[in-house]
Curated annotation (Swiss-Prot):
It is an enzyme of class 2 (transferase). GO terms for molecular function: alpha-1,4-glucan glucosyltransferase (ADP-glucose donor) activity; alpha-1,4-glucan glucosyltransferase (UDP-glucose donor) activity. Its EC number is 2.4.1.21. This is Glycogen synthase. GO terms for biological process: glycogen biosynthetic process. Pfam families: Glyco_transf_5, Glycos_transf_1. The gene is glgA. InterPro entries: Glyco_trans_1, GS/SS, Starch_synth_cat_dom. HAMAP family: Glycogen_synth (MF_00484). Pathway: Glycan biosynthesis; glycogen biosynthesis. SUPFAM superfamilies: UDP-Glycosyltransferase/glycogen phosphorylase (SSF53756). It catalyses: [(1->4)-alpha-D-glucosyl](n) + ADP-alpha-D-glucose = [(1->4)-alpha-D-glucosyl](n+1) + ADP + H(+). Keywords: Glycogen biosynthesis, Glycosyltransferase, Transferase.
Length: 478
């Protein structure tokens, strides 16, 4: 089985969110299961310098972008048993930031066509091309409309498209069809690519892929509804026979409190008390009151409305009347950043607002905290709660998307469950469930059992990789 995994980012080379983690961990797990899996991403300027210097030039060729004929270099590097390819074009990718440029349509039109040209140039034919999010959305379109019709090399290649966040769809002016792809407006007028008055990369992928996946079972159902479907719900209902939810996992090599070099004291489920040394160290480092008995609640997140920050802002003053500590790590919208800075100023020994993305501090927060807050408005899968479980930090989540699938509400009478959850997007419900969690925290026997349940949860990539592999095999035999 040969699989080409196409993404706009991949850890450890470069990442801005969960997609980068998936593109770094899932291919590695597939390779362990005997799949010849290769990953391709753009060669951005910001790629990890240490790794960038190890990239080896393979070959170059020209790629048609409408009437343009652009240079494309292919570099490669093998990491953890997986070959990574890097599509090089200084004009498109050697600039600050991965996304948000005025010509993103052109940049990723080039990338998508370069990927299809690359496999022919390298004479490596995958059974399946696995595309991820809108930046790769035109690959299934190009494959079906053009490459399969022109060249027998491509005729039996299948395509999978994974939706990591349906809110970002890549919609651009219809003029990109002739300008960037050399097509007429038929695909716009027949509505296969039409979204409002634009052309949607993601809509095209949904229409032309052989299989559609998303990153949790619940999110696969949610995006078929008007509330979560971002006006593609009707199309996903039509395509529901080819839509599957497969839960993300986390990389158990990277996130392992037993040998994590970024935390102060390593521990595992058999010596949970060592976790408290991490707590005391972080309290001291952040200027909080050093007391292992005070419950510490952490958030490591983008500070955006999607993450439920409106709820936390609304209850923060009432919440902080409790004897707790709140640790925030992340950046995002300015009004949230300012609010948490103000809380830090007002409640200096109870609140630590770290308005930056700091991977070292993130690992320390997972290891030190007692509870991990994710009251998301929507959450396709979520990785934070999975990492928190691994480190014995009990997730407090809203029942949506992957949070609903991975967190089982604690039952104090049976001792079952691995976290706490609430259903409605309501600030008072959030406050109530946090206060309930605090009540359980002070019952040390119950809390100790809950932490063991959390740390014994299995969220590795192995099970998910099996589901992907079965899907690839099913597609390749069609």
């Amino acid at each position: 089985m040969r699989v080409l995994f196409v993404a706009s980012e991949a850890h450890p080379f470069i990442k801005s969110g969960g997609l980068g983690d998936v593109a770094g961990a899932l291919p590695k797990e597939l390779a362990r299961k005997g799949v010849d899996v290769r990953v391709v991403i753009p060669k951005y300027r910001e790629i990890n310098n240490e790794l960038k210097n190890k990239l080896r030039f393979n070959k170059w060729f020209n790629v048609d972008v409408g009437w343009r004929n652009q240079y494309c270099g292919i570099l490669e590097y093998e990491y953890d048993g997986v070959i990574y390819y890097f599509v090089d074009n200084e004009y498109y990718f050697s600039r600050g930031g991965m996304y948000g440029h005025y010509d993103d349509a052109e940049r990723f039109a080039f990338f998508d066509r370069a990927v299809l040209d690359m496999i022919k140039q390298l004479d490596w034919k995958p059974n399946v091309i696995h595309c991820n999010d809108w930046q790769t959305g035109m690959i299934p379109v190009l494959l079906k409309l053009e490459y399969m019709r022109k060249d027998m090399f491509y005729w039996d290649i299948k395509s999978v498209f994974s939706i990591h966040n349906i809110a970002f769809q890549g919609v651009f002016d219809p003029v990109i069809l002739p300008e960037l792809f050399g097509y007429d407006y038929e695909q716009y007028t027949n509505t296969n690519l039409k979204f409002d008055d634009g052309v949607g990369f993601m809509k095209g992928a949904i229409n032309y892929s052989d299989m559609i996946t998303t990153v949790s079972y619940s999110y696969a159902e949610e995006i078929k509804t008007p509330e979560f479907g971002e006006r593609l719900d009707w199309l996903l209902r039509e395509k529901s026979y080819m839509l599957r939810g497969i839960l993300n996992g986390i990389d158990y090599d990277e996130f392992n409190p037993k040998n994590d070099s970024l935390i102060n004291k390593n521990y595992d489920v058999n010596n949970i008390n060592d976790k408290y040394e991490n707590k005391r160290n972080l309290q001291s480092e952040l200027g909080l009151s050093v007391n292992e008995n005070i419950p510490m609640i952490a958030m490591v997140t983008r500070l955006t409305s999607q993450k439920g920050l409106d709820l936390l802002v609304h209850i923060s003053e009432r919440l902080l009347q409790n004897d707790i500590q709140l640790v925030i790590v992340g950046t995002g919208d300015k009004h949230y950043e300012d609010h948490f800075k103000w809380l830090d100023y007002k409640y200096g020994n109870k609140v630590s607002a770290n308005i930056r993305f700091d991977n070292n501090l993130a690992h320390k927060a997972y290891a030190a905290s007692d509870m991990f807050l994710m009251p998301s408005l929507f959450e396709p899968c979520g990785l934070g709660q999975l990492i928190a479980l691994r480190y014995g930090s009990i997730p407090i989540v809203r029942e949506t998307g992957g949070l609903k699938d991975t967190i089982r509400a604690y039952n104090e009478y049976t001792g079952e469950g691995n976290g706490f959850s609430f259903y409605n997007y309501n600030a008072d419900e959030l406050l109530h469930i946090i206060e309930y969690a605090l009540k359980i925290y002070y019952d040390k026997n119950k809390w100790s059992n809950l932490v063991k349940n959390a740390m014994n949860s299995n969220n590795s990539w192995s099970k998910s990789a099996d589901e992907y592999l079965n899907m690839y095999k099913e597609l390749s035999y069609r």
